[in-house]
């Protein structure tokens, strides 16, 4: 082997070996235990960033570790290639999204190879190709035929100037990002998949996911939002308002029913439209509400606004008349779009009632009998009913049941289960996505495109004007036939979450002449380890779980869930610096262009950019283009080698925590690999070592061998069960420090060092595979890619001797080395006769001797 560690040449050589030998190409093998490891596939944005590198390094470490456990490991990669950024880049660079996307894929593929990830490239695909989305289109038509797909009008962001629909991220402060025109909400027909049909199963099956972080499961439970309540009807005073006889509301707190003082309805509620017909002021308010898109999370903090409709509702039990208001905090797509308002016991209702001078009627008091005060805020806890007629004195559950029973008996309400989860809207009014395979004939009937006419291909040779989708602008593209009749194609495309909801399954049989080949899919699925960011908890991870159940019910897979174990890696942070420009805005400066001075504690005391300007340190924040604080992985690989970058990524922080990028840490990782290289080189230059003869080892040799096997046991557990990769690396580093100081003179010394170095190299292999490949060969072993993970020798862990601490009156006076099986009497005799101990006990009476087996002897004397 070469004397100096030269990662660049070495890594190229090893990567060529993997490519030439198709090392990571796998197929189904019923005689081998399978392991499917998957990192969330990348969007081909142009260049890898450090977040990608962290995600894919974790996946590669897990894959290679499992490979050395003797498993049949599949680790595929592909490209989540549709989406809005490609459209924006195409407009900016005067090209079409397709060539921009394919160029990026080629560049990023090369970057992934340079990092040494062990992917089965035979399974690679990009979701923007017809070979992929054709099966998605066909599956969608099957769902339509099963009644799981429907079309209804739904609200979108509309720019009246550009006459186009905007994605949420294209709306900035309520205006179009391109022309700054105020954005309106517009109702247009869109396609939906009935995920709500699976809401209960999606909720229940979270309990099966023992390998998922609790936090992600909690987020999904909240997103699905199952609640038990009562759907009840308030009659309208004028017995019938244009065909509406009553007003349905849903409540989870029927115990508060006697405290209702008004009813709130959403701006999109049919009654609101009726009430506004002869009321221009109300019509204007409704329009304002519709054009103010409110996220559910903002409802609690936003200003509550409303307007009376002039309609009156009648309380279903006590007959009291209550006004009906349009309120901006009532959402049309939750429950019935109407709420019974109980200001004394709901904070939003309280704020609204206070603002508009509506009655506040308390009907619940604390169980403990403490005083009830609703003058400043609502009392929202569950308690005991009062001023509620026959229900007085009942606590929550009893009141819930009694009031629900009375409403049911009178035909005015029913107990019901509600879900916060809404059906999945899959229509996007964009170009760069998979065309939705539906057509409309001249009689207005909608039909799925027949399977023999699929795929509906998205034209790639287009001109982007940045406003209208090319397939909407090209009237000829939409023209087609259905059963010989003229028809028009759907010009919306699928939400890109569609492609990412089943890609994990396509990897099992990427060339299959169907969405999946069941026998292959059922060999590999479910995914054993999935790795990705927690920001995908409620969308991608939920849609994938849903899609898996759809595939199961269509007979393609037998499992209920797609991902057995989930690891959510933390973000990568870096220093960020800025200066204020003439307009008072922040100009962000790349950290590589900043010279910093630090005090003794490492805090930044001064920072200047390359032009000598003072810049402000904004702290360690997430690497991003907007803050200009991303570090190019390519530069780091060119400078230090892929193994060093991988080692730093896995060592600098626990995998699920944020990682602070420090180049000094990268340098430290590089120094460590040089030390490993040097020690192996020194050892192998002296020739081959013999086999270990455990019986012939000295005490020191046994102790060193024990350290080696303890390290193997710890590293195995840290990588496999605990997934604390950083502590595994720390243990290897600690062992290396001992090996560097270990004697190498005798044959037995060299034997132990040989065993230890082979263990170190094998344990480093998942993390730093290139250097490990080379050092393994230098140590006389063949092909580390197919080697076995080191196993620890239980006998080597057994200690022949133990060190006992001896205290006199609680103070350390001696340390004894005794046989591991020494009795209490033997230890006491040795301790009491120890030369140093007797100095402190001479002339004293020994009152008590306390022995903690294998650890401590405490002598009490006075």
Curated annotation (Swiss-Prot):
A motif ('HIGH' region) lies at residues 42-52. A motif ('KMSKS' region) lies at residues 622-626. Pfam families: Anticodon_1, tRNA-synt_1, tRNA-synt_1_2, tRNA-synt_1g. GO terms for cellular component: cytosol. The keyword Amino-acid biosynthesis does not apply. It catalyses: tRNA(Leu) + L-leucine + ATP = L-leucyl-tRNA(Leu) + AMP + diphosphate. GO terms for molecular function: aminoacyl-tRNA deacylase activity; ATP binding; leucine-tRNA ligase activity. Its main location: cytoplasm. Keywords: Aminoacyl-tRNA synthetase, ATP-binding, Cytoplasm, Ligase, Nucleotide-binding, Protein biosynthesis. This is Leucine--tRNA ligase. The lineage of its organism: Bacteria, Pseudomonadati, Pseudomonadota, Gammaproteobacteria, Vibrionales. The gene is leuS.
């Amino acid at each position: 082997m070469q004397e100096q560690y030269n990662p660049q040449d070495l890594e190229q050589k090893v990567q060529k070996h993997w490519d030439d030998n198709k090392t990571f190409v796998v197929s189904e093998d019923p005689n081998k235990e399978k392991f499917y490891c998957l990192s969330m596939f990348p969007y081909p944005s142009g260049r890898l960033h450090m977040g990608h590198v962290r995600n894919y390094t974790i996946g590669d470490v897990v894959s290679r570790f499992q490979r050395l456990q003797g498993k049949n490991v599949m680790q595929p990669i592909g490209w989540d290639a549709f989406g809005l950024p490609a459209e924006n880049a195409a407009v900016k660079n005067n090209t079409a999204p397709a060539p921009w996307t394919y160029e990026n894929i080629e560049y990023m593929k090369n970057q992934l190879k340079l990092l040494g990830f062990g992917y089965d490239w035979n399974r690679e695909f990009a979701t923007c190709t017809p070979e992929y989305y054709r099966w998605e289109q066909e599956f969608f038509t099957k769902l339509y035929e099963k009644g799981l797909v429907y079309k209804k009008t739904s609200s979108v962001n509309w720019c009246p100037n550009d006459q186009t629909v905007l994605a949420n991220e294209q709306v900035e402060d309520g205006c179009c990002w391109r022309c700054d025109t105020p954005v309106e909400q517009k109702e247009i027909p869109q396609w939906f998949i009935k995920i709500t049909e699976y809401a209960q199963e999606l909720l229940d099956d979270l309990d099966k996911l023992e390998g998922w972080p609790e936090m992600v499961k909690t987020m999904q439970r909240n997103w699905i939002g199952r609640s038990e309540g009562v759907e009840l009807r308030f009659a309208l005073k004028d017995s019938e308002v244009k065909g509406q006889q009553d007003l349905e509301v849903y409540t989870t707190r029927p115990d508060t029913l006697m405290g209702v003082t008004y009813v709130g309805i959403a701006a999109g509620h049919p009654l609101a439209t009726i009430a506004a017909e002869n009321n221009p002021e109300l019509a204007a308010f409704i329009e304002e509400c519709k054009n103010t898109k409110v996220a559910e999370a903002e409802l609690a903090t936003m200003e509550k606004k409303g307007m009376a409709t002039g309609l009156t509702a009648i309380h279903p039990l006590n007959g009291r008349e209550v006004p009906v208001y349009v309120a901006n905090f009532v959402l049309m797509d939750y429950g019935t779009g109407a709420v019974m308002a109980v200001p004394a016991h709901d904070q939003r209702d309280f704020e609204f009632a206070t603002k508009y001078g509506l009655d506040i009627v308390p009907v619940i008091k604390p169980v403990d009998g403490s005083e009830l005060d609703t003058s400043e805020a609502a009392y929202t806890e569950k308690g005991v009913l009062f001023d509620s007629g026959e229900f007085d004195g009942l606590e929550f559950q009893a009141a819930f049941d009694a009031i629900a029973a009375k409403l049911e008996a009178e035909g005015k309400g029913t107990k019901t289960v509600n879900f916060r989860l809404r059906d999945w809207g899959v229509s996007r009014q964009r170009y760069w996505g998979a065309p939705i395979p539906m057509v409309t004939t001249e009689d207005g009937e909608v039909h799925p495109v027949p399977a023999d006419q699929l795929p509906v291909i998205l034209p790639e040779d287009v001109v982007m004007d940045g406003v209208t989708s090319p397939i909407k602008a090209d009237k000829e593209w939409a023209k087609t036939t259905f059963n010989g009749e003229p028809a028009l194609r759907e010009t919306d495309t699928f939400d890109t979450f569609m492609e990412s909801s089943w890609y994990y399954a396509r990897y099992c049989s990427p060339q299959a002449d169907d969405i999946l080949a069941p026998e292959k899919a059922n060999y590999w699925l479910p995914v054993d380890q999935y790795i990705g960011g927690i920001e995908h908890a409620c969308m991608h991870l939920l849609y994938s779980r849903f899609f898996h159940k759809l595939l199961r019910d269509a007979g393609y897979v037998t499992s209920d869930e797609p991902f057995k174990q989930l690891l959510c890696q933390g973000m990568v942070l870096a220093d960020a610096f800025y200066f204020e420009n003439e307009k008072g805005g922040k100009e962000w400066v790349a950290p590589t262009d900043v010279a910093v001075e630090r005090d003794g504690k490492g805090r930044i005391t001064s920072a200047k950019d390359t032009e000598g300007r003072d810049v402000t340190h904004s702290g360690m924040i997430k690497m991003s283009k907007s803050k200009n604080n991303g570090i190019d992985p390519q530069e780091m690989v060119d400078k230090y080698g892929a193994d060093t970058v991988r080692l730093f990524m896995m060592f600098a922080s626990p995998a699920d925590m944020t990682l602070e990028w420090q180049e000094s840490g990268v340098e430290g990782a590089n120094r460590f690999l040089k030390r490993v290289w040097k020690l192996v080189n020194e050892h192998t230059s002296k020739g081959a070592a013999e086999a270990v003869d455990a019986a012939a080892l000295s005490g020191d040799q046994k102790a060193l061998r024990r350290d080696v096997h303890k390290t193997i046991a710890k590293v195995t557990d840290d990588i496999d069960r605990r997934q604390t990769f950083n502590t595994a690396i720390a243990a290897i580093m600690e062992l290396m420090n001992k090996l560097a100081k270990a004697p190498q003179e005798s044959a037995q010394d060299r034997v132990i060092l040989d065993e230890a170095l082979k263990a170190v190299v094998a344990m480093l292999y998942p993390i730093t595979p290139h250097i490990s490949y080379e050092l393994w060969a230098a140590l006389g072993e063949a092909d580390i890619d197919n080697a076995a993970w080191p196993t620890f020798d239980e006998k080597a862990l057994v200690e022949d001797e133990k060190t006992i601490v001896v205290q006199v009156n609680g103070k350390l006076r001696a340390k004894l080395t005794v046989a591991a099986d020494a009795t209490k009497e033997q230890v006491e005799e040795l301790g009491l006769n120890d030369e140093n101990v007797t100095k402190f006990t001479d002339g004293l009476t020994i009152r008590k001797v306390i022995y903690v087996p294998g650890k401590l002897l405490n002598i009490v004397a006075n």
